[in-house]
Amino acid sequence: SLLLTSSVQHHLLRRQTRTQISMVVEAGDVREIHHVALLIAYGAAAVNPYLAFESVEDLARDGFLTVGEEKAIANLRNALSTGVLKIMSKMGVSTIMSYRGAQLFEAVGLDDAVIDDYFTGTVSRVAGCGLDDLAEEVAIRHRVAYPNQWTATPHRNLRTGGDYKWRRTGEEHLNDP
């Protein structure tokens, strides 16, 4: 969703029509404060992380949380909102209008062509993936989510990933304990 949001943002800027619309991003891949912060920084006026809301709602309904569905959703909404405000504060930005579209982040691991075409003006000191690499990542995730062999009972256990911090069942990293 970030690639698409930034792409639309820059297309509208190049056509000098950006101020004529507001982008509302409804995305299933948004699950963390950082994701919301990036989407707003790259042009989104509002973000609806629908899959995160549905997941929290299911967890509350199934008794995995100590609060009801409405409270769980309100808690997530509050956490995302206050988290974005905290990020803005640390960057010295006091209004959402100043933050939206400001691109105050540095890209890590995207090649120059992707930066130039889709994240124009974003600082990037470490190059890496191109569009083909990103497409393959999406295809891999799709194959995992929708395997060819369907089982009678849907799986309920999702991988934790361990992308940001060590997890016993997460990916292996050089600095694991």
Regions found by a protein language model. Give the residues of each.
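Beta-strand segments within the central parallel beta-sheet cores of soluble alpha/beta enzyme folds
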Residues: 20-28, 98-102
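Conserved, mostly hydrophobic/aromatic
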Residues: 8, 39, 95
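Conserved mixed alpha/beta core segments that line enzyme active sites in large multi-domain catalysts
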Residues: 1, 11, 171-175
